[in-house]
Design a protein with these regions (language model features):
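Short, flexible, glycine/charge-rich loop motifs used to bind or transfer phosphoryl groups or to couple energy/partner
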Residues: 18, 69, 162-165, 195, ...
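Catalytic-core region of carbohydrate-active enzymes that cleave or remodel glycosidic bonds
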Residues: 201, 222-322
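Non-catalytic accessory regions flanking glycosidase/transglycosidase catalytic cores in CAZymes
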Residues: 21-74, 386, 402-427, 431, ...
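Short, electropositive alpha-helical surface patch
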Residues: 135-136, 155-162, 287-290, 327-330, ...
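Active-site mouth of glycoside hydrolases
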Residues: 26-239, 243, 250-251
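Bacterial Sec-dependent N-terminal signal peptides
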Residues: 1-23
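Aromatic- and carboxylate-lined catalytic core of secreted/periplasmic carbohydrate-active enzymes
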Residues: 264-268, 275-279, 291-428, 441-457
């Protein structure tokens, strides 16, 4: 009898262990049937990303798990991380990523050796997987390729190593490039993209471009590119003067609009807008800094224009600024473990919740809903809709005239959605008119942002 009890107990433990391991495997991310969005197990997947560029190189395992857990609780489901920021890259424990700074010769070790650079990446990936978080891996930062003159053979060897090592992980996304124009070393970028795609065809791949550009400029028709990324960047309207850029200023919705109209259809998102608490234009730390209101604006503007998600960033968190740093970049003043709870980070989940609150895959940009005066710059109104609903975003809380007659049904239920706290205030239900006027709560001002929700009845 005792032996039977022990045997049953052992079997139960094994089954629980298997079940636990299976629960850690995340569903494969795929492109939706209409090629506009992501899906996981056929369900909508809204990319709610955070920028954790130096996670692998600057945090120990305890802090890495702390970071991931906080972001999980805040609703983030993707973290963008550099694999190699430089050829001299080391991790928190001092272990080098490469032998002799040779990208074609990674310094690997037995899987049981805890302080190996690559073993630590493995560990972080597994922890993220347990928490339901996908990791967008940037194989090598753009400046490394440009300055070190990495050739195609080295790139292929390195990409082969990465793809083989991480193709079995359920939570990997590939983010080729790294703050660089695709035209700079384009053969290397195509080599990395093609190599990873050939070995690991089941994981999505994109390209992280230079500020004020979009991956579609160079790679839209490449078979390895699953979806587009833009970097609307960190400059304000007055700073966007470069002749070589698209010069959209802060209007990140324009980049999304460009990608949305391209064929073949591919999803697109803003993978690097202005970071919370980073100076306007990055480099002059005496200038004002972007706030939570700004990161909300970039999020709602881009998503309502047709993006499949959005990546948030924070100046202190993206560089994992901590007391051991000899200095900081871009005037970072606070430590990552404090800034991780900044207002903008806590407000991002309300964007995700709103987008998933209505039928998702049918959603399209819908500027024709705005009857008059779509507005310029901060006064721009951005509209999106499904078959029976519509969302219209105002950053300044200004009055709006809406073509409610475009929605089906005889009645319209109207509500205000607050992007700062996720609360919904019902305006009322009324007989459908051709056009209707709406006046958001509060006085018009930058950051008094609201979403008008219209539901057809």
């Amino acid at each position: 009898m005792f032996k039977n009890i022990v045997l049953v107990g052992l079997i139960s433990c094994v089954l629980l262990s298997i079940k636990s391991q299976q629960a850690e495997v995340l569903p494969e991310l795929k492109i939706s049937a209409n090629h506009r969005f992501f899906q996981a197990d056929g369900k909508p997947f809204f990319w709610m990303g955070d920028t954790g560029w130096l996670l692998f190189s600057k945090l120990n395992r305890e802090d890495a798990e702390k970071y991931l857990e906080i972001r999980r609780k805040q609703g983030f489901n993707v973290i963008q991380v550099m694999v190699l920021h430089s050829l001299s890259e080391t991790d928190f424990y001092g272990d080098s990523a490469l032998n002799n700074r040779n990208i074609a010769n990674p310094k690997i070790a037995d899987a049981n050796y805890p302080n190996n650079y690559w073993n630590n990446i493995d560990w972080v990936l597994k922890k993220a997987e347990e928490k339901g978080i996908y990791i967008a891996l940037v194989p090598v930062w753009g400046s490394v390729v440009k300055s070190a003159h990495i050739n195609q053979n080295q790139a292929k060897t390195y990409a082969t190593f990465l793809a083989n090592r991480y193709k079995s992980y359920s939570n990997v996304i590939w983010m080729n490039g790294g703050d660089i124009p695709g035209s700079d070393s384009i053969k290397v970028w195509n080599t990395i993209g093609n190599t990873i795609h050939a070995i690991d065809p089941n994981h999505l791949i994109t390209f992280h471009p230079r500020g004020r550009t979009e991956s579609s400029i160079w790679f839209h028709n490449e078979p390895w590119l699953s979806f587009n990324s833009i970097q609307s960047g960190h400059r304000n309207y007055s700073q966007d003067t470069s002749k070589n850029d698209l010069r959209y200023g802060e209007d990140n919705w324009r980049y999304i609009q460009n990608d949305y109209n391209k064929t073949p259809i591919k999803p697109t998102l803003d993978a690097e807008p202005s970071y919370e608490k980073i100076p306007y234009g990055l480099h002059d730390i005496t200038l004002p800094r972007w706030t939570d209101a700004d990161v909300r604006r970039y999020g709602y503007w881009s998503v309502f224009a047709g993006a499949c998600g959005y990546t948030y960033g924070n100046n202190d968190v993206m560089q994992m600024h901590n007391p051991k740093d000899k200095g900081s970049a871009y005037g970072s003043k606070d430590y990552w473990y404090t800034s991780i709870n900044d207002p903008g980070a806590q407000q991002m989940v309300y964007l995700e919740k709103l987008m998933l609150s209505r039928p998702y895959f049918e959603r399209v940009p819908a500027q024709s809903l705005i009857a008059a005066n779509q507005g310029q710059r901060y006064n721009r109104l951005i509209a999106t809709r499904g078959k029976d609903y519509a969302f219209i975003y105002t950053y300044t809380g200004r009055n709006m005239d809406i073509n409610t007659g475009q929605l089906p049904g005889k009645k319209i239920k109207a509500s205000w959605y607050n992007p700062r706290n996720g609360e919904t205030t019902i305006i009322g239900t009324f007989n459908k008119l051709k056009t209707a006027k709406f006046n958001p709560p509060g006085q018009p001002a930058n950051g008094n942002d609201w979403v008008l929700i219209l539901d057809a009845i």
